[in-house]
Regions:
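Helical "substrate-binding/catalytic lid" subdomain
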Residues: 1-101
Length: 101
């Protein structure tokens, strides 16, 4: 989500990004659900709220607290969703964050 949001903001062609990402993801089902629809203008491709993502990442961070390098990466991802929740976007679907709201 973060990568597609940044690409959208930078006016990078989402189809080209998706084509490259598919090659490295092993044709990920989650990527396909999000990207196919987002490229067509439908940002509701991944039915999981930002609030739920933040909750899950909070649990993951807690599990990783004894692995500092892994926890740092997880914390960075969590901060993206925390910022969205703080801006009142918690009820959006995570894939809706691709669009600039």
């Amino acid at each position: 989500i973060e990568t597609f949001k940044a690409a959208n903001h930078l006016k990078i062609d989402l189809q080209k990004l998706y084509d490259v990402a598919k090659l490295g993801s092993g044709n990920s089902g989650a990527l396909n659900r999000i990207a196919d629809k987002a490229i067509a203008g439908n940002y509701k491709g991944y039915v999981f709220s930002v609030n739920n993502v933040l909750k899950d990442l909070t649990y993951i961070n807690e599990l990783l607290k004894d692995l500092p390098h892994a926890e740092k990466l997880s914390s960075l991802t969590k901060s993206f969703y925390k910022e969205a929740v703080d801006k009142g976007k918690g009820d959006l679907l995570m894939s809706e964050l691709i669009k600039d709201h």
